[in-house]
Structure formats: C-alpha cells, structure tokens
C-alpha cells in the first residue's frame, strides 16, 4: 500500500491496519 499509510507490502513503514 501507500508508504506509511497502510500495512501492505508497499508500505514503509507498514503503519495502519488496512491491507
């Protein structure tokens, strides 16, 4: 997901709870 927004493989860091 978007960086720093969602806990998805594309998020760094994975912040949030949406996949």
Curated annotation (Swiss-Prot):
Annotated localization: Secreted
Keyword Secreted attached: yes
Protein purpose: Has antimicrobial activity against P.wickerhamii and against Gram-positive bacteria B.subtilis and B.megaterium as well as Gram-negative bacteria X.campestris and P.solanacearum. The synthetic peptide partially inihibts growth of fungi P.capsici, V.dahliae, F.graminearum and F.omysporum.
Principal subcellular localization: secreted
Alphabetized UniProt keyword annotations: Antibiotic, Antimicrobial, Fungicide, Secreted
Keyword Secreted among UniProt keywords: yes
Source taxon at top rank: Bacteria
Protein name (Swiss-Prot/TrEMBL): Antimicrobial peptide GP-19
Gene Ontology biological-process annotations: defense response to fungus; defense response to Gram-negative bacterium; defense response to Gram-positive bacterium; killing of cells of another organism
GO cellular component, one term: extracellular region
Organism of provenance: Xenorhabdus budapestensis
